[in-house]
Amino acid sequence: MAAATQFLSQPSSLNPHQLKNQTSQRSRSIPVLSLKSTLKPLKRLSVKAAVVSQNSSKTVTKFDHCFKKSSDGFLYCEGTKVEDIMESVERRPFYLYSKPQITRNLEAYKEALEGVSSVIGYAIKANNNLKILEHLRSLGCGAVLVSGNELRLALRAGFDPTKCIFNGNGKSLEDLVLAAQEGVFVNVDSEFDLNNIVEASRISGKQVNVLLRINPDVDPQVHPYVATGNKNSKFGIRNEKLQWFLDQVKAHPKELKLVGAHCHLGSTITKVDIFRDAAVLMIEYIDEIRRQGFEVSYLNIGGGLGIDYYHAGAVLPTPMDLINTVRELVLSRDLNLIIEPGRSLIANTCCFVNHVTGVKTNGTKNFIVIDGSMAELIRPSLYDAYQHIELVSPPPAEAEVTKFDVVGPVCESADFLGKDRELPTPPQGAGLVVHDAGAYCMSMASTYNLKMRPPEYWVEEDGSITKIRHAETFDDHLRFFEGL
């Protein structure tokens, strides 16, 4: 099986139409397109010496954010004024992406991986928009799956099954049978998971390529809700149980082929030496596995690289920084590297766009109330996560700058998008965006309070606007009860 990333090209067919709603005189009219889906169904180095990169001379382009304020005070996405987009689409909260930024983010990983046999597996859980998946697949990406439906969606988007990795601590037998039939990699997470994979192999009549998910117990220094590789995690196996799993694989040669080892430390990681520390341990496990006669050829270091949510000018690790910490380790053992980026591929490509409903004060608290909410974007409420917030247009000259909680209309005190944000007092109807909303935002959206999931658009390379997901409607909700 070829492990290096393949570069596929399959253009989507476009069916453009101009939205009919009028724009204000000071705005230009922006056509919004609707996509019609096109569907297809050993050299030895010492571990200590190996952690220093030999690729540091590579020139990396400085990151230039796709959403930025211009000197005129307006927010632009790839040169297109966000306020103009708001006036050209349905008046409701929506997600707005930069398609070119998605491409640039993936290219950064591909550049970093030059010279390393690799699979870039996009973590579908971060954002499962079908058009985004098709775009990433067309650029040569693989997919990382944590449910049977994510596997089905990956197949619908045209991903090569041999570049897909099925993760999860509770994979069902039905989903494992599908994975076995399609030939995807499966990460073994527990004793019962291994038994189910064996059964799935027998049902499907196909041998399953498996990796062992081993917890290296390296502290990722992140929020406990997104730490996944410590000794008490619900994911993976403890290293002291490794021999039991190796013996079980040996006992089932027709059903299982052990091809690699996997770890996943967590998410929003901002120190790449943490990945290095984990990779050093994983190499030790791989050496032991090979000593027992297994032809292990893959090291999967997971994902989790963080981004600059604060927009405070922090210098964060790049994909090149990440890969350089493990490059020589991987090459020293002649391994194929699998990485599982999600947030770092898609988060900074998107804003959540809202209208200001009004401003109010209670006691010592000032509130900006918007039409978006925790139903559409739950990260701040769930993790107390910070996402940068700003207005899309210049405020009135007399607008006072003060501290606001930015809140939505959902009937929960936890319904906030940001707390204690210094912002100019906005007029009613003003546009307000929550930045870096491409990952774990729309994919975690709900219909709480019957807030229907919003539409999604992206800015194309030529500056045109394309709808990439329809808004959900009240009629969509009622359809679940038809015929009952």
UniProtKB/Swiss-Prot annotation:
Disulfide bonds: none annotated. Residues 1-49 form a transit peptide. This is Diaminopimelate decarboxylase 1, chloroplastic. The modification N-acetylalanine is found at A50. The keyword Plastid applies. Substrate binds at R343, R379, Y383, E412, Y440. Pathway: Amino-acid biosynthesis; L-lysine biosynthesis via DAP pathway; L-lysine from DL-2,6-diaminopimelate: step 1/1. InterPro entries: Ala_racemase/Decarboxylase_C, DAP_deCOOHase_LysA, De-COase2_C, De-COase2_CS, De-COase2_N, De-COase2_pyr-phos_BS, Orn/DAP/Arg_de-COase, PLP-binding_barrel. HAMAP family: LysA (MF_02120). Residues 1-28 have a biased composition (Polar residues). NCBIfam families: lysA. GO terms for molecular function: diaminopimelate decarboxylase activity. It is an enzyme of class 4 (lyase). Its main location: plastid. It catalyses: meso-2,6-diaminopimelate + H(+) = L-lysine + CO2. It comes from Arabidopsis thaliana. Specifically catalyzes the decarboxylation of meso-diaminopimelate (meso-DAP) to L-lysine. Pyridoxal 5'-phosphate binds at G304, E340, P341, G342, R343, Y440. The modification N6-(pyridoxal phosphate)lysine is found at K125. One of its GO terms (cellular component) is chloroplast stroma. Belongs to the Orn/Lys/Arg decarboxylase class-II family. LysA subfamily.
